[in-house]
């Protein structure tokens, strides 16, 4: 498979495997000189070139373009040649050099007092600036040369000419005008949109994927196509790269949405849904996204799932085969080309197919003919191919987009996976069966191999923007009472719409998720999935833990007497047996540490009870708002975010809920040094006080950095503890090496009194807030009744 990022895969002169299209184009050009060759139907209607079919020099082409304007600035003949010259001159010389040639001609004409020719040159430049202002926006050297030319004209006293080539109109252009027009988002509040993948209809999903595709396709300019033809890759071509990355992202998203379901029946339901989405994309004539979806469904990581395929109906499989046949690369995509040419109005082509056509045409035809004349027919053919794609950008799609769903899909498509990771997850779902008979060879999968070398790697700023937009949309649709929280059940449904799972959610309030917590969740998950990549190759081994241990995947407790869970020998991750195949954290190999050292969960130390916000609290154990999250690979500065206390609900032997709160503890930036490692503080509030932020117990933890890549605070050196007076006193007595004296007991008594006072104050505050909320609720109910009575 070739890629756009590898120039070596491009066809070269003298190669024996020139694409069929290139040979056909040669026959079209030379059909007049070879009457015995059967004519091939031209791909586009071309204007008669006349004497230009034999080529022309660069100076002759410039002269013809200047003469295309009359003294009033109107265009006469050679108007299409003018378009070709301005858009395709990059194949011949840089834009700055073309402007310098025009400047030289202007100076010579002004010296010869040929004012009419000077006026035509100014009309030519004005047309260039007006119609192709994007070139000046993108090329700083061209803009500078234009300003110097303008100063030259003004210094000669030609005010009329100076006004014609005024560069102010370049800066007055709204750069985002073309990028935001023509697609009108649906701002109607009558229809409530669902952000849940399982609730989305195939038509709705296809329309919003088309919205994203057209938005990326519309941004590709003449210069972008031209740069790709010359370089053969998308390096330093961001608009082209974003379009290709979107195509690859959709293909990967389809695969991982299927693989994210645990059972064959559920995977078959998702697969069936995407086949119906493909049908709707075909009806919308969005062939590029159709290629991405079918390419994902036909990928070997999906096609090998025999148990899943067994639950797909015959009719659905028939539709998939029809779509695969439509997009087959056989006979140079003959089926697709036939259907595409029959389509009218709005349509989005398979960009890779047409880019291959452009490269084939560029390689098959020489740049110069005899006597070093420019091959004008080649420029004309390339212009027609590119112009057809550009004209499609002016046709608005027949749809209305809901921006909330657009934001959710945009974040979902920010993926970065490798082929090995796809196969690893596929084999985790359905392991290889060595006894199964060999599979009958089938049709080659539909994969956009031309774009496989481009990996969508959004930068952290883009990820943050996508996350914030998505979170705003979630709370707009699900936080109906506008209290800043959504339920745990709603969050789990929303999270299921993404092709990645993540750790247990942080909770400030039991059963409710705040805006800050859901933002932190998706920031961490998106950063791992879209930037760092994932490695599923953990070396898990069944392990017996001698001390209490938590699962690094679900944050649950590893219960049992022996062989409670699994431990990765490479990175030290701990997890349940049922979580072993669901781990999405990358395996980071660490320095060699003994099992005994890693298994020890807590170092002996002194237990201190420090009231929240009291004088005894030091900056070694700050609140959660002060503790920054540490990203792998040192990306903490980029992804700095405000994180809450991490609460885990455990069940004790007496069916009593125990709240274990974990929070990172980091020295203040002003006092932090490189030699002082981070530490963690385990806060174990009393079961009776688990719902109020009162007194917490701070357990000093070993500063050993966690080898586990989990972004949640490590629990390798911490354990849950049932907090009651007897256990606390007993632990303190053991740590102090003897029975507590009278002074220690008095201090503890005073400390408990201070804690009791703090809790009473917090209880009163909570009661006042409850009364306030009740009053607001009564007022809201009364207002609603009055409104209903009046209506």
Curated annotation (Swiss-Prot):
GO terms for cellular component: cytosol; endoplasmic reticulum membrane; Golgi membrane; plasma membrane. It is found in: Cytoplasm, Cytosol; Cell membrane; Golgi apparatus membrane; Endoplasmic reticulum membrane. Residues 466-501, 502-528 form the EF-hand domain. Its main location: cytoplasm. A zinc finger (Phorbol-ester/DAG-type) spans 537-587. Residues 728-785 form a coiled coil. Ca(2+) 1 binds at residues 479, 481, 483, 485, 490. Residues 683-715 are annotated as: Disordered. It comes from the Eukaryota. Pfam families: C1_1 (PF00130), RasGEF (PF00617), RasGEF_N (PF00618). Keywords: Calcium, Cell membrane, Coiled coil, Cytoplasm, Differentiation, Endoplasmic reticulum, Golgi apparatus, Guanine-nucleotide releasing factor, Membrane, Metal-binding, Repeat, Zinc, Zinc-finger. Residues 49-172 form the N-terminal Ras-GEF domain. Residues 53-106 are annotated as: Ras exchanger motif region. Ca(2+) 2 binds at residues 506, 508, 510, 517. It is a peripheral membrane protein. Signal peptide: none annotated. Residues 683-695 have a biased composition (Polar residues). Regulated by F-actin polymerization and probably by calcium. Residues 702-712 have a biased composition (Pro residues). Residues 201-432 form the Ras-GEF domain. The phorbol-ester/DAG-type zinc finger is the principal mediator of the targeting to membranes and is required for functional activation through DAG-binding. PANTHER family: GUANINE NUCLEOTIDE EXCHANGE FACTOR, RAS GUANYL-RELEASING PROTEIN 1. Belongs to the RASGRP family. Functions as a diacylglycerol (DAG)-regulated nucleotide exchange factor specifically activating Ras through the exchange of bound GDP for GTP. This is RAS guanyl-releasing protein 1. It comes from Xenopus tropicalis.
